[in-house]
Amino acid sequence: ILYGCGDAAMLDAGGLAVVGSRNVGDTLVEYTERIGRLVAEAGCSLISGGARGIDRAAMRGALEAGGQALGVLADSLERAVLNRENRDVLLENRLVLISPFDPLAIFNVGYAMYRNKLIYALADAALVVSSDYEKGGTWAGAVEQLERGRFVPVYVRVDEETGRVMEALQRKGALPWPNPDTPEALRELLTSRVSPKKTT
């Protein structure tokens, strides 16, 4: 069972899943908002978990650029649906909010871990912007997808600041994010159907 609000057709649309840490600095927030804007410009959907930090930055970037976003929530669906910030874009059929849990459910770590499967399953590809090392929901969700789920290719942000977290995910089969800088390049990435890397 999925509870939700918005245009259910968006659940079949695919798109780019963007995930990451809750506690991040302004530089990563701005980076993630740019990714969201690019997804919107490409005419694709942005899929994320709706949590503070990277998730909301990605969704905000897409929606403010006139695009579509799909939030897979671990808790408080009713509150999110009634939030004034979400109301207009829900009515415009540009935002869908869903949850596998009761709309009144409060936050639970297990719920957050479980909903990660849906984020990946609804996407054509996924980008991990940031993560803690060997702990937290972003790490657990990415590792589960790489080692067991393998629904879609998992990309990781790679630059001079990413360090051992992204290197560790690449060893598990993640791909370096190629930083597409045009809508056409992003669409090509999402439709190329790259097979998820298999670890040995």
Residue ranges and their predicted role:
Residues 1-200:
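Glycine-biased, small-residue-rich flexible motifs in mid-sequence functional cores and linkers
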